Regions:
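Boundary regions of SH3-family modules and the immediately adjacent low-complexity/disordered segments
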Residues: 5-7, 11-17, 21-29, 35-77, ...
Length: 115
């Protein structure tokens, strides 16, 4: 992440993990101004961004269900900070996979650009 939209600006932050979700705040040519989960903001070149939809679980022990209803079978509880890959979302639910598990989770326990 850089302080401005060009390679001439100083590096502000280096990400060491792939697929972290970010929210895009602005654009300037091939650069996007982003905000990450820790509220860091800065500029990143579009070639470094993935098209994969991801989010971070923000509630400890969030339940992953087999179907998009609380009456469905619980599969696993996810810890805070868990990276999840979003397959699709409905009004209140998202179908995700993470750590070999796949199921439905409430949308309001996820951080990232869900829709």
């Amino acid at each position: 992440m850089r302080q401005g939209p060009s390679f001439e600006y100083p590096i502000k932050l280096i990400y060491k993990k792939k697929y972290l979700p970010v929210i895009i705040l602005d654009k300037s040519g091939p650069w996007k101004k982003i905000k990450d989960f820790d509220n860091n903001t800065g500029w990143i070149h579009t070639v470094l961004l993935s098209k994969k939809k991801t989010a971070i679980n923000i509630k400890n022990n969030s339940v992953l269900y087999k179907k998009s209803t609380i009456f469905s079978k619980p599969i696993v509880k996810l810890e805070t900070g868990r990276l999840v890959f979003i397959k699709k979302c409905k009004v209140e639910w998202c179908k995700i996979n993470s750590g070999g598990y796949e199921g439905w989770i409430f949308k309001n326990v996820l951080w990232g650009k869900i829709n």
